[in-house]
């Protein structure tokens, strides 16, 4: 996986800090949640993983992995919110 993901994540976190008026705690949680998803992608892929390769089935597979780790419903809901917001941002900036 290339550095594009990390660059986009950094840009996204700066965006939500500057425009969405979210708490530093939320930014920290979102960073951790999205980085956990990126690590999931890294484990699945042997090469670069493109933004447009993420689909509903892959997202469901990731969420199933969270359920398998016995995360609370609140934690899973926050993960979903973080990923939804991140991918909406990626669409908005036309990645």
Predicted features and spans:
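A detector for short, charged/polar N-terminal pre-domain segments
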Residues: 1-7
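N-terminal core-binding DNA-recognition domain of tyrosine recombinases/integrases
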Residues: 10-25, 31-95
């Amino acid at each position: 996986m290339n550095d594009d993901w990390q660059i986009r994540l950094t840009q996204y976190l700066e965006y939500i800090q500057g425009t969405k008026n979210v708490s530093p705690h939320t930014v920290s949680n979102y960073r951790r949640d999205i980085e956990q998803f990126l690590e999931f992608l890294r484990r699945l892929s042997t090469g670069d993983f493109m933004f447009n390769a993420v689909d509903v089935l892959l997202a469901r597979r990731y969420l199933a992995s969270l359920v398998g780790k016995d995360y609370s419903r609140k934690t899973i809901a926050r993960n979903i919110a973080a990923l939804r917001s991140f991918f909406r941002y990626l669409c908005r900036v036309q990645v």
